């Protein structure tokens, strides 16, 4: 008995000694003294769509992050939490330092860049100078095309360069200005970088940047100082925060040497000697994963840090650390709605439609002025149309903007100007309808200067149940279930007979047995299993290499 007790006591002493040397990580708990701290929400998902559905059904202000699991396999799991709780663990836990912000589709966002080139393939390239010239060029484009004033002091400059690769992230911190979404950011950059893209298509080797011991030959003069005018290259200047170029004139003017800026410094070579742009134009896609400040790619040691030549400094606060301020500034989709916020748009060059699109009826027909389509929630669009189609007035949706952090849809209304503040219609100023999907309410605001000065906001009115997110998700799930039941029913009646949709494709009998549907289900199930295994083996399991306490043990201790 004594021996057992002594052995037990020894185990306890060893465990106590271990935790004295390596104490358990503290747990995030919002404090009453800081009411701005959100409640704890920490959910992991194997699929990105599941994570976004949870965010949309959650009342709290939560966001989606992607976490790399294993080296080389590209698998990621998705974390949903608040910025505050994420930063609480992120700043101290090594197994979280391979994270990405998921930039939500259709969400208002900041202007951002991913810059890189191979150092051995470009021995004369001066990366710092290239970044400075690019920032100056983009600032001039923003000023001429949109009337937005900015400088290098408004650009957060992050670096993760190695001996092999120069790598930077730039995130513009524009004052009361953001882009409609990252697709519009990509359109804007493709237009202003067209002269550099033209160089890539040139067969003349002389057009490629020559490298010398002092850098590229064109570094002596910034392109923004060469007398170049964007208004000449792009035939229409910004009107009401949007602009569209005439493609024929663009080609004609783009071919004129005197009207094109010298962007040869943006053309670099890869390790195969092929030309490509210093600016990665592939990062402006739906639900893009963009690496976080202080994160490295899994298997790599170099994280994104603030550069020595960074000129942006966040506003200091007594309650918030500088590091947390930099983190919040680095988030591309961290944009809040305000009455003074301007939304910039840019349509692709091949789009011949001009102007802002608005819906002219509750039906499906769309009258296009600028080429915008439905919001992410068409049911909400139709509800808003019902609000502005009454009393003999046929109002429309001039445009919409989606603010992901608040799950807020902001509709600019046209042809309907009735304002609750003055009890009548404005003579010349339009109104806005704002739909708060988290709180399931809608309200009206104004573009009228007097209403803006009063910070007018109408009473909140409840949304109809059929346009609330929980109802929409339930309806979607029921539709998916019914579709699956119908498929199983058809297979039960005659498992060897192809459905009409399959017959319409002209598939043979052999093709029916190997039509790819079972394979799709099999691949999906396999992917789920692999993701679950990856999550279990990497993020959720004990990592002996970094010698951290596993999440399960923390939860077990808290429960005890």
Curated annotation (Swiss-Prot):
Its cofactor is Mn(2+). Can act both with Mn(2+) and Mg(2+) as cofactor in vitro, but Mn(2+) is the preferred cofactor in vivo. The polymerase activity incorporates correct dNTPs with much higher efficiency with Mn(2+) than with Mg(2+). The fidelity is slightly more accurate when Mg(2+) is the cofactor compared to Mn(2+). In the presence of Mn(2+), a conformational transition step from non-productive to productive PRIMPOL:DNA complexes limits the enzymatic turnover, whereas in the presence of Mg(2+), the chemical step becomes rate limiting. A motif (Zinc knuckle motif) lies at residues 419-452. Residues 203-223, 480-507 are annotated as: Disordered. It catalyses: ssDNA + n NTP = ssDNA/pppN(pN)n-1 hybrid + (n-1) diphosphate; DNA(n) + a 2'-deoxyribonucleoside 5'-triphosphate = DNA(n+1) + diphosphate. It is found in: Nucleus; Mitochondrion matrix; Chromosome. Residues 1-22 form a coiled coil. Residues 490-507 have a biased composition (Polar residues). Residues 481-560 are annotated as: Interaction with RPA1. One of its GO terms (cellular component) is mitochondrial matrix. One of its GO terms (biological process) is DNA replication, synthesis of primer. Its main location: nucleus. Zn(2+) binds at residues 419, 426, 446, 451. The zinc knuckle motif binds zinc and is required for the DNA primase activity. It facilitates the binding and selection of the 5'-nucleotide of the newly synthesized primer and the recognition of preferred initiation sites. It is linked to Myopia 22, autosomal dominant: A refractive error of the eye, in which parallel rays from a distant object come to focus in front of the retina, vision being better for near objects than for far. This is DNA-directed primase/polymerase protein. It comes from Homo sapiens.
